[in-house]
Amino acid sequence: MPAATTHVEMAKEVYALSAYLQSHITDKQMFYLGSQGPDLLFFNRASILPGSTKKYGNLMHVAKVKEVIHYFEDYSKNDPLLRSYFLGYLCHYCLDSIAHPLIYGVAHALHTEGGPSEGEIHVTLESAIDLHILKKKGRNASSYNVYEDLRQDPKNVAKLAKMYRNMFHAIFDISLTQKHLERAIKDVAFFTKVLKPQQTKYKIFYAIENTCLKGSHAITGMMLQGEKNYCVLNTEHTAYT
């Protein structure tokens, strides 16, 4: 993927394209949340704690993608709120389809050259893209506030969780509780705020990673702080496999 900020900023640019499109997006907050696609499930319980919905987000990225899109399209057709979410969801896959091949290629190449795990490099690359996007908007890391665009009214959370619960049952034959999915949706705004750049917080998380996560720095890699020297923008047009 790219990460949360890049997906939301793309959604904002899509929204600005035409009045016709805006007439079909009646709730911008739901549209922006939709732009997170299945990544919505990655934030639950910080991704690494027991019971996280991360594995279901991974599943949605690799299995029955078309079926899920068709399910959400049909489910949301008479509900303007969920339709706004669905249109944002489409934006997610548009951006992923462009960015994923490059991110995976660069991550694999850097790992092969002796870098950390591909997963750690992947999220660090994504945060580098986020930082680049903010700079293009005349902003910097300290202005990071994507969590404000991802907050939801409790009624909206309940409605979206119900759609996901029904989808998992219908498409994957997986039973998830309404409560679990509502918590996962709320965790998106909560944990993207936890990732807000701050030097002391960065150092604390970095030390925790060294102590408890065997030196894997995937969490701090998601923060728009620290060294971001990976050439993910590929301005030299290097070929990756």
Task: Go through the PLM ranges and name each one.
Residues 1-87, 93-241:
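N-terminal leader/auxiliary helical segments
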